[in-house]
Amino acid sequence: MSTTRPRAATHSASSGSVSRSSKHSARVITQTPVDAKLQAEFEGSVHSFDYTKSIDISGDSSSVPSETVKAYLQRLQKEMLIQPFGCVLAVEEGSCAVVGYSENAPEMLDVVGGAHAVPSIGGQQQEGGGGGGGLLRIGMDARTLFKPASAAALQKAATFADMHLVNPIFVRCNRSGKPFYAILNRIDAGLVIDFEPVMPSDVPVSAAGALQSYKLAAKAISRLQSLPGGDIRLLCDTVVQEVRELTGYDRVMAYRFHEDEHGEVVAEMRRPDLEPYLGLHYPATDIPQASRFLFMKNRVRMICDCCAPPVNVIQDKRLRQPLSLCGSTLRAPHGCHAQYMANMGSIASLVMSVTTNENGDDSEGGGQQQPQNRRKLWGLVVCHHTSPRVIPFPLRYACEFLMQVFGIQLNKEVELAAQLREKHILRVQPVLCDMLLRDAPVGIVSQTPNIMDLVKCDGAALLYGKRLWLLGTTPTEAQILDIADWLLEHHRDSTGLSTDSLAEAGYPGAASLGDAVCGIAAARITSKDFLFWFRSHTAKEIIWGGAKHDPNDKDDGRRMHPRSSFKAFLEVVKRRSLPWEDVEMDAIHSLQLILRDSFHDIDDSDSKTMIHARLNDLRLQGIDELSAVTNEMVRLIETATVPILAIDSNGLVNGWNTKAAELTGLLADEVIGRPLIDLVQHDSVEIVKKMLYLALQGEEEQNVEIKLKTFGIQEEKGPVVLIVNACSSRDLEENVVGVCFVAQDVTWQRIAMDKFTHLQGDYRAIVQNPNPLIPPIFGADEYGYCSEWNPAMEKLTGWKREEVIGKMLVGEVFGIHRMSCQLKGQDGLTKLRIVLNNAMAGKETEKFPFSFFDRHGKNTEALLSANKRTDAEGIITGVFCFLHVTSTELQQALQVQRMAEQAAMDRLKELAYIRQEIRNPLYGIIFTRKLMESTDLSEEQKQIVQTSALCQRQLVKVLDDADLESIEDGYLELDTIEFTLGTVLDAVVSQGMILSREKGLQLIRDSPEEIKTMCLYGDQLRLQQILSNFLINALRFSTSEGWVGNKVVPTKRHLGSGVNVMHMEFRITHSGQGIPEELIKEMFVHNQDMFQEGLGLYMCQQLVKIMNGDVQYLREAGRSSFIINVEFPLAQTDKQ
């Protein structure tokens, strides 16, 4: 199927993250020249610039000269202007020689007016430099401008690979002692250092600026994490509220980028007297692609005064390229943006980027990838103020951390939305099948539900056999036929088309359709027949969030202003509909395939042969896999060096391996049959009870700590502490019959942890003890530097103690780069920061899932416990972290468990495949029968077709029985419809005719004449299923040349008030020795080893039981009988 998107040619549709990434890249490439054109027009004609007319998203970008685009990109990335509230130095790495500085740097850093020149690195005074250089000159040693301690701090920070981790550095000028925050970022020419003055009201931070900054956002982070899932609007409302409380701006907005790059204000907190912008949409040009690139590079962007004249940056003339200020916190706003802010009455702003994973998945692949390259810009949190405003860097850093947490929560919402989409697809499938069980294909437009229920649309149509069926808002019949002809002519090789703009897709008659139809999804079902879905223009979907623009206002539409942007967006989107989402196209494609199959002849014999072959392969493969899994499981349990214990459904121990016996001092013979509760410590009783209860319900808890009592020689060592994973044990019918606890002994780890956190004994002797029982331990001081790394951590990670001590724990030791214990992306880094900061604040974390890649790229899964570390006076001096890593044996046991689960899942998938393969020819049979019903038939022919229809409906009913548990437990919901008993018996007998003829059996019907027309209320198809199963079994176990009789004995009972109930005795008698006794037992008692015939008998017996009836099997001399007793209400009063 083809698809079109704004300003892109028609192309084949694809799905997945690769397709989305390609589409995004295409939009960026196409949008950038439009941005460049707009900027060029603004700079070329400031006073006559008409913003509304300049924005035309649908304009042709190919007309923009490449030189204009190149100049535009260079201008944005290489502009040498900064804001005046701070100053900039650019230095060479290593030597710290100045290669550039802002013109206000000499004055701000107090190096103007001194009597002595500042010596350079080589000991000589530098001349020149020009432009207000004073005593600050190109080539001088920048370290001499600051106090020795500050110079040393800058020198140390310059050695960090990721300077973001150590920003800001608190420094003081050498001459006046004036305090600054120094913010470093690395460029090709060296280092760019921003210096922001520390205000008297600020609380100066230490060298651990990043770590300290997180504390400022602790409350906001806790609130975000406590929000219920499934509500992105609430999440956005909360984050803007928290940012406004943190920063104090007049207006804070959450701004989301849509798939076509345009933006929308989805949440807002503002001063009451300000005009609301909530709900406004803005064209993509409002935030150019180059600016979005800068937002990805510099996640927080502050403009303190858009009206303040910018300051020029001077650089060494010997540099080949202009200094890049892309990462500078002081970079000046571009003229177009400054004008935009001024027009909307905003003087200061703070913009924070919100990024999410490209594919919406929290796991981002292996250790050899660069996770940061797989982020995308979801949107922005934008703050505006009506007067100049400066936010200190530590607080901005806290806001950036809050945005990272916000991004994690958004990822969770995206994953939840993906799950809901999958559920939607699963709900759509029965709808599709139901459509085809009716008048295919006309029923999908003439009945309810119809194709408009499949996807969101304004109208739909079916073109079939040169006839049209219309639903909702559609083009006229003549226009639809013209669209079909255009598709056949220009898209003859495609199975369909989807576009949000017929005009841009090239349809010549798009203008005549008006605004009612802009987008279309067309699916070809035959060579000349189509299904159509139509959507109107987007503008009607957009709601004004605030007061509508008053036409009497003298707002100049030529000025750049949010309302002007919104007006421009309305002009653009009235020619375009909402885009068709992937999940919608999947649903349309599924219906297309099923309909196309309905028009093809189906070879029943080939299908039957394929299905039987597949079933045989499935049976053999299943036996081999389950046998291998069982043998491996038994071997592992017997030889495992981790404790494994099993409990039955009554809570009694029925499994106890050697390791469990070793730890507790109790042999298996001593515990088998005893309640598990008797073997656990008092404080673990409720925990174990809850685990058992949930596991027996099928809910398996993981990583739960319990304590077992010890006996005999082990008793003096105290209780055994275990981390337990509960695994529900199931029979072949997926019934939970017990629980298996796979555990890890953490007794020594718990003892060590208690000693560390309470400062008992010589902790260093314990930490550095090479004893394998000591867990992996690492720690950080109050500044965030790694202060502990024990031998177990060395062995686990491959990194030596001397390689990590003194480095930043988050970012350098655990980071997203290869030269560290690499985490799975930025989200993993953010989560670790939250855990450590919570511990530093006194909030301990237990058993937090934690994974990283060791030095050799091997993934390590562990549970992390973080605890504060205090000195003798109780003052927090750092954090201790303990890792619980599952042993090899436990990992193998869990792997075997996963193998068993995978084998079961494979069986389910294979069964689903078989069901689908049966359904496809079944749909063809149903379609053929419906065609026969529409012809002139005799009464006998009509009865044959009716019997065939009942058999087909019974087959569909059985195929839909995905939940056999409901039948076994007696909770199945029965249908109650009026039916004629004679038609049921005809359908039952027809199912036995082939087998009876093959075996030469005589099939005898012995029922009163009134049975044929007797009308009853009940579940017709279930009764038909029961009787046909018993009849087939009777035929299968009858002797050749014998007979099978089918007798019905009705007995009417009066219940009063004109209500009559008919008691029916169905007796199916057959010659021979009868059905084997083992199968008859299986009909009444469920067991794990039953045959498929036994399972069928058992299910039918359960169905009879659900219908408040009973089944017997009576053996007599030379014959045996199924006797089924069940009652049905009469559908009409007996007149006789």
Curated annotation (Swiss-Prot):
Phytochromobilin binds at residue 336. Residues 11-20 have a biased composition (Low complexity). Contains one covalently linked phytochromobilin chromophore. One of its GO terms (biological process) is detection of visible light. Residues 629-699, 762-833 form the PAS domain. GO terms for molecular function: phosphorelay sensor kinase activity; photoreceptor activity; protein homodimerization activity. It holds the Pfam family GAF. Keywords: Chromophore, Photoreceptor protein, Receptor, Repeat, Sensory transduction, Transcription, Transcription regulation. Residues 913-1132 form the Histidine kinase domain. It comes from the Eukaryota. The keyword Transcription regulation applies. Residues 1-28 are annotated as: Disordered. Regulatory photoreceptor which exists in two forms that are reversibly interconvertible by light: the Pr form that absorbs maximally in the red region of the spectrum and the Pfr form that absorbs maximally in the far-red region. Photoconversion of Pr to Pfr induces an array of morphogenic responses, whereas reconversion of Pfr to Pr cancels the induction of those responses. Pfr controls the expression of a number of nuclear genes including those encoding the small subunit of ribulose-bisphosphate carboxylase, chlorophyll A/B binding protein, protochlorophyllide reductase, rRNA, etc. Homodimer. This is Phytochrome. It comes from Picea abies (Norway spruce). The lineage of its organism: Eukaryota, Viridiplantae, Streptophyta, Embryophyta, Tracheophyta.
